[in-house]
């Protein structure tokens, strides 16, 4: 990074409001930059020039809930996105076509984790879901202890070496077998005052 970086390009996307919060980081893959905005639109830009390549609106049945959260991840020729109303979608990275869209459970806050042929997502109500990357069908799910209050963001699950690790807002940390969600281990992390 240069001592005095200069702006190469910028783009305007829908930002935060009282009913929608923009908290997702952009993702760069294959020479493109992908981002989800506060209105649940996924946008693709040329990473070098900033030219908008496409945008796709994530349709949602919604029920008046706010669009707090969501995120994007990229793998191969697909983008995977989550929204604050609980949608998970696979999107064609070349043209923005939605390949599948599912609602596995409650509001989703963080970006999806992509590994082992699955899309792993965490919900605000302490659920982890493993969806098939090709079909979007739920392969397994599990729940942490439900909390009456929580933080705005939820950490994405970590995945590696055949294990998926979920950190829940209750302080629980659980390791799962990626293919079936079997608990491998768990621990409760204490809160600090």
Language model features with spans:
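Extracytoplasmic beta-rich repeat domains
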Residues: 3-27, 55-75, 98-115, 138-161, ...
């Amino acid at each position: 990074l240069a001592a005095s970086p200069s702006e190469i390009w910028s783009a305007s996307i829908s930002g935060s409001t009282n009913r929608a919060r923009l908290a997702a980081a952009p993702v760069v893959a294959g020479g493109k930059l992908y981002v989800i905005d506060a209105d649940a639109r996924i946008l693709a830009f040329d990473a070098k020039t900033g030219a908008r390549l496409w945008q796709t609106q994530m349709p949602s049945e919604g029920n008046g809930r706010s669009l707090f959260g969501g995120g994007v991840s990229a793998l191969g020729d697909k983008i995977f996105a989550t929204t604050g109303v609980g949608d998970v979608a696979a999107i064609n990275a070349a043209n923005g076509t939605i390949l599948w869209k599912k609602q596995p459970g409650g509001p989703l806050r963080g970006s999806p984790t992509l590994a082992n042929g699955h899309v792993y997502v965490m919900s605000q109500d302490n659920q982890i879901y493993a969806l098939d990357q090709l079909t979007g069908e739920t392969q397994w799910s599990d729940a942490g202890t439900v909390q009456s209050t929580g933080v705005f963001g939820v950490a994405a699950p970590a995945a590696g070496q055949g294990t998926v690790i979920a950190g829940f807002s209750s302080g629980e940390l659980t390791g799962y077998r990626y293919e079936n969600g079997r608990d491998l281990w768990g621990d409760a992390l204490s809160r600090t005052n």
